[in-house]
Amino acid sequence: MSGGKYVDSEGHLYTVPIREQGNIYKPNNKAMADEMNEKQVYDAHTKEIDLVNRDPKHLNDDVVKIDFEDVIAEPEGTHSFDGIWKASFTTFTVTKYWFYRLLSALFGIPMALIWGIYFAILSFLHIWAVVPCIKSFLIEIQCISRVYSIYVHTFCDPLFEAIGKIFSNVRINLQKEI
């Protein structure tokens, strides 16, 4: 241990002292998680993406599945030439496919940037503004709820109990006259 350098039991060199359970920068999370049957935390930034199934949560199942048959249909008795129908199908499908790719290439990254900033702002506001305001409100309202509870038990409970006793002896007899 010379020059502010520390060595752990496995021979690794550190610039900060190592505690038995790990330091705050490099805790023994994996070993501790195995012992305590806890989940390991994975970094969201290093997560691999699936290039085949790009909608694993099926967000756009009912919205964007627009095929040729969903847009253009010829009823019985009103058919165009078969060649025209096939060419229309091919034109529609290829145009939709390549125009989507063109729009994605031009606007995909800027839109991802905009939505990333937007959801970062939403997350920031939720974490640093909304939740603390709600917690603060709940703490402050607790005092008011105690005063309100005392008021109800002191004034309202006896009043409504007395009114209930007054009307408890009221009997209604309904008869049907012919």
UniProtKB/Swiss-Prot annotation:
Phosphorylated at Tyr-14 by ABL1 in response to oxidative stress. GO terms for cellular component: caveola; cytoplasmic vesicle; endosome; Golgi apparatus; Golgi membrane; membrane raft; perinuclear region of cytoplasm. There is a cross-link at residues 5, 26, 30, 39, 47, 57 (Glycyl lysine isopeptide (Lys-Gly) (interchain with G-Cter in ubiquitin)). The modification N6-acetyllysine is found at residue 5. InterPro entries: Caveolin (IPR001612), Caveolin_CS (IPR018361). Residues 2-104, 126-178 are cytoplasmic. GO terms for molecular function: molecular adaptor activity; oxysterol binding; protein kinase binding; transmembrane transporter binding. Transmembrane segments: none annotated. One of its GO terms (biological process) is caveola assembly. Keywords: Acetylation, Cell membrane, Golgi apparatus, Isopeptide bond, Lipoprotein, Membrane, Palmitate, Phosphoprotein, Ubl conjugation. The modification Phosphotyrosine is found at residues 6, 14, 25. The keyword Membrane applies. Residues 2-94 are annotated as: Required for homooligomerization. Residues 105-125 dip into the membrane without crossing it. Disulfide bonds: none annotated. It is a peripheral membrane protein. May act as a scaffolding protein within caveolar membranes. Forms a stable heterooligomeric complex with CAV2 that targets to lipid rafts and drives caveolae formation. Mediates the recruitment of CAVIN proteins (CAVIN1/2/3/4) to the caveolae. Interacts directly with G-protein alpha subunits and can functionally regulate their activity. Involved in the costimulatory signal essential for T-cell receptor (TCR)-mediated T-cell activation. Its binding to DPP4 induces T-cell proliferation and NF-kappa-B activation in a T-cell receptor/CD3-dependent manner. This is Caveolin-1. It comes from Equus caballus.
